[in-house]
Amino acid sequence: PFAEQPIRYQLAEESFPDLYENSNVCIKVSLERLSWQSKERKLDWKKGAGWIEELVEGLLSTLAKVGKINLDLMDFKTIVEHPGEATILVGSGDTNSLSEIVKTALQSPLSNLEVSGAKGCWIQVEGGPDMTIYHLNSVTEEFVSLLDSDCQVLLGARSSDEMIGRIRVVAVVSGLRTSSNRLIG
């Protein structure tokens, strides 16, 4: 709630240049955005940030676990180095609601960023052993169709037993606006 705490907000803003200079990627999470997300997802405040855990877990497991189509740190670096800001998106649901999964992902950025002009996209689609090429293709095509027509897309896919009947999309989109190219938020 920085609006009520201008000094705290100023200190936070002043710290970002040092963070950018001393890190490869900086993840910025807005309390206002968390509040908005909990309202949009119809969750109480205590549970409203649970999707961040899903987002981080999806990002880390994409990098650490072997998939059918693997994404790695170099792929991640390639995408986040596009000039502009970047954000992480996550959406999940059952295999019968593929459009809803994409819609949920597009409503999940950590900051209020418009992703339609994204120049880079690192997208991981995870499903159970029942996930088909149709599921992978449908989710990916619908998601990517909303980005810049020249967007560089790197696709990963993984199957895991705990995702039976479900699909999860974790994406990093970059090249948004014209600010620091290392901000994910």
Q: What residue ranges belong to the model's regions?
A:
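Tubulin/FtsZ superfamily GTPase core signature
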Residues: 1-185
